Amino acid sequence: LPDELEGMPEYSPLVFPMMDYVIGHNIDFDADCCQIPGAVKRICTLAMARAIWPNTSHTQSALLYMLSNDRAATRERLRNAHSAGADVIFCYEILLAILSERPHIRTIEELYAFSEECRIPKVMTFGKFSGMPVQHVETGWRNWYRRQTDKDPYLLRAFELYPYDPMYKE
């Protein structure tokens, strides 16, 4: 609210040092909010977690509980779950668990490639085709989506990789 801003210091945008990669849980949200330049490669722990552990909730809290050996201690740690510092630590712990599941990933570029692969949906997450394989999304709907102004580039890539196939079986 405007009255809460009275007497506060002037806003100045964040300035990030030169970086090649940024890692986060739902990284596009963080990168867009922080105005991280588009040339920086985004690595998404949310997308990788969805690929590695498809049958669980993928919030940071749910993943930390799933990965935990001490739920009481995890519950205590999660009391600070909505601070930036805690989010960074939790994201790091999830990243370590992802890397333990994928020991062949040895470099940041391999991690980025895996993240990019995981970000391409295989199942629709919204609309009338929600929950269905991308191959079941009809051509007309695909064409409609391509005409929208706010398109997900990863869904467009999925349309390229997985053409419409009404006979497709999982």
Task: Annotate each predicted stretch with a short phrase.
Residues I94-E170:
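Acidic two-metal-ion nuclease catalytic site recognized across multiple nuclease folds
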